[in-house]
Amino acid sequence: MQPVELAEALASFDEVFAPRIVGYYNGNKIQVAKAHGEFVWHSHADTDDLFLVLKGRLIIELRDGVVELGPGQLCVVPRGVEHRPRADEETHILLIEPVGEPNTGDSSERAAAPEVELET
């Protein structure tokens, strides 16, 4: 068992909205991702969506409002709530989702990213 260096993990790729798995916890994948620009509107029917900002600012647009997050802040979007993450600058985030859950909530969505593990 070794600690995971999140900054090193994030430095190992450039793609945005393409999470990388850095570990597993009770059937969930722990992921890091970079955000810049707008992601697609989506929801997750069977699971909540957790966003923890490590660096930068993340804006989570909801149909009835906006949540703005800075470093060290997190937000849990409840299952079934439509949302769209966006970032006006490169932002680093940590995500926790069940294994097999697409980042778009729907694997047929063209923006759905494959599950990619980083070597830790």
Spans of features found by a protein language model:
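Double-stranded beta-helix
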Residues: 2-10, 23, 88-120
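A short glycine-rich, His/Asp/Glu-containing loop-to-beta-strand
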Residues: 6-41, 47
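A cytosolic small-molecule/anion-sensing beta-strand core signal
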Residues: 26, 54-55, 70-71, 89
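Short, charged/polar surface micro-motifs in flexible loops or helix N-caps
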Residues: 27-29, 36-38, 57-59, 66, ...
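Short, conserved beta-strand element in jelly-roll/cupin
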Residues: 34-35, 43-62
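Short beta-strand His + acidic residue motifs that chelate non-heme Fe in jelly-roll/DSBH
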Residues: 42, 60-61, 77, 82-88, ...
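Short glycine-/acidic-enriched loop or helix-start segments at secondary-structure transitions
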Residues: 62-63, 71, 87, 105
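Short acidic-glycine-tyrosine-enriched beta hairpin
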Residues: 63-79
